[in-house]
Every structure is written in structure tokens, then in C-alpha cells.
Amino acid sequence: MFLKKIYIKNFRNHEETQLTFKSRLVFFIGNNGEGKTNLLESISLLSYLKSFRESDQNQLLRWDTSDTFIRAEFESEGNEYLFEYGIEHSQTKRKKLKVNGEEFKKISDYVGYFRSIVMSPPDILIIEDGNVERRRFLDAFISSTNRYYLKQLIEYERLIKQRNAALKKENASDREIGIWDEPIIEHDSEIREIRTKTIQSLAGYFHQNLLQLSSGKDPYFLTYKPNITSKEEHKQKLIDNLRKDKAIGYTSCGNHRDTLPIGFDDKDLSGFGSQGQKRSAVIALKTACFQMIRDTTGEAPVLLIDDIIRELDVKRREYFVNLISECGQAFFTTTDLEGINEYVGNLTVDKEIYIIDSGKVKVFTEI
């Protein structure tokens, strides 16, 4: 996986930026607020078609403009791809996506073309904020490579919204609510099966990574505890919980209530871990995602690393450098130009530096 070119127009504070990449390691250097993370964000859209920072895509548009556009050329598994993505500022947020000139009517059909892993400071919330954030992380990770899962998830969420609307409806009959139960059960089962297999694999990578990061001092585990374990149990719970669900106005069982404990002996890292332990767990988890994609596809995903190296101690930096040496291509943002050589100066791979100032980009030099 290798990104060769990117062109962005009216994206955040970038009016028009065009870059060509020839190196495995690319650094975006600049003070806070100058637009370096915006560049990383534009690259992440090639994978996720949405920001890793912002839920409202209208915020991606440059101030006082009506649309934004991204064009990129990348190579994957020996094939060349031309990616074109436009977002129009409106209540409906009209989007148009083309790959090699072919328009995608459904965004979910694009999944898996450009694979990347984002590492950024807010990732610590995966540990600190518990199961809602962890389910969001897991869904995003699986959906980034599995189109079938994404379609199942989209349909499940649509069905839950429909059932919840019926639950809130005054004098809704049990039959009116129950018509949603069977399709919900079917989609829930598919999602649960894929989540189970994913966590079984991801957990192994995570545990080994964390042992290596902590020199064996933090033997924590990632586990998956589904809210429902079978179709039969799900059907019975929907019946048993109907009165309660009517009272609270939403569906109280299903995969949207799954838990993903990280810790040991029923103790979760969110409650007892130090900041260093939590940071190590995040790095171990994101590295596990990288390793799992690399091993299942045979090709390393692109790493997008947003200003986190300076937060790491010596041990974690060494681990990070080893990870970088395994990747196909990595993009970094940092304010610390002087520290780059200290982190990756010994790696015998090509490197490029770009200086970002008020949304303007210029080539600095090779390290």
C-alpha cells in the first residue's frame, strides 16, 4: 500500500495543496493550528470516507466555500488506483466518489481499497471512555476492510432506529413493535459472529504487543462479551424486555450493548491504569490492527501518526521505531523538527519533510 499523490481543494485551511510522495516516511512539520493534521486527515479519508476528528463533514470544508475535493493516486497489491471524492456543503451533505473513473453509488462498496491505521492522541479514549468508544473503534476497524460487515451494521442500526421509534409511539401495539424483531435478530447474529472472530485474532496480537511494550509487567487481555449469545436468547430477551423497552423508549438488548473489557480478573484498565499503562494499551491495540491487516491481506496498511511520538518514553519510542520499520509507508505530524533524527534517524529508508504554515506546504529537505 503506497500513496503516490494527493490533491486537496478547500479542505479545512488548505485552499489548494498538491503533493507527490516518493518516500516511505513522510513528515508534516508545523506549529499547532497550521494545518499539518488536516493533511493527515485528508489521507485518512481515502480509507474511511469520514474524518477521524470530526463527525460533521461540513466542518471539513474551508471557511466560506461550498464544497471540498480530494484526488489521490495510490498503489495496492500491484494495482494503480485514482481516487476522487467530493463533498458538497448542504443539509444532506451530498458526496460523490469515483475510483478509476467509476462512480460508487454506495459508500459501503468502496471499503478496503485504501487501508490505513490512524494513531492520534484522542485514541486514549478507547481505554478511558469504556464500551461505547470501544464498540465504535471495533466497528470502524472491521468496517475498514469488510464490506459485508459494514452493510450488516448499517442495516442493523436502521432496524434498531425503526424499533425504537415504534417503542416511543403512543399506543403502539406489540405486533407493531415485534415486526422488527426477526430482522434485528438475523443481523445481530451476523455482526456477533464477525466481532467474535475479529477479537479472537486481535486479542492475541494485542496481548503480545503489550507484553513487549511493558517488558512483561502489564499482562492485560482484550476480551469480547456479547450482550446476546444466540438467536434463541435474543428472541426471548426481546419478548421479556418489551414492557421495559416501551417505558424507556429504546431497545435494551443486542450488539449495541456488547462489552469489550481490557484488563484482567474483571478489572478494567479504565479504572485502575496509569496514563502510561493506558497509552501502552492504545499503542498495543492500534499496532494489533496494523498487524492483523498486514497478515490477513499480505500487505501492510499505511500508518497515519498524529503528533504522538513526543508523548512516549524511551521504551515506547523504541517499540514505535520497530513498528515503523515494518510498515510500507508512514505519515507523521509533529511540531518537533529537531527530534525527528532522534526518533527515526537510524532507519535506512527514504524520508521526506514538508513544512506547513497557515495551510501552505513547502518541501523542507531530506533527513
Curated annotation (Swiss-Prot):
Q: Which organism is it from?
A: Leptospira biflexa serovar Patoc (strain Patoc 1 / ATCC 23582 / Paris)
User: Does the record bear DNA-binding in its keywords?
Assistant: yes
Alphabetical list of Pfam families matching this protein? SMC_N
The name this protein carries in UniProt is DNA replication and repair protein RecF
Instruction: List keywords of the entry alphabetically.
Output: ATP-binding, Cytoplasm, DNA damage, DNA repair, DNA replication, DNA-binding, Nucleotide-binding, SOS response
Residues holding ATP:
30-37
KW Cytoplasm (keyword) present: yes
Output the PROSITE patterns linked to this UniProt entry: RECF_2
User: What does the record give as the function of this protein?
Assistant: The RecF protein is involved in DNA metabolism; it is required for DNA replication and normal SOS inducibility. RecF binds preferentially to single-stranded, linear DNA. It also seems to bind ATP.
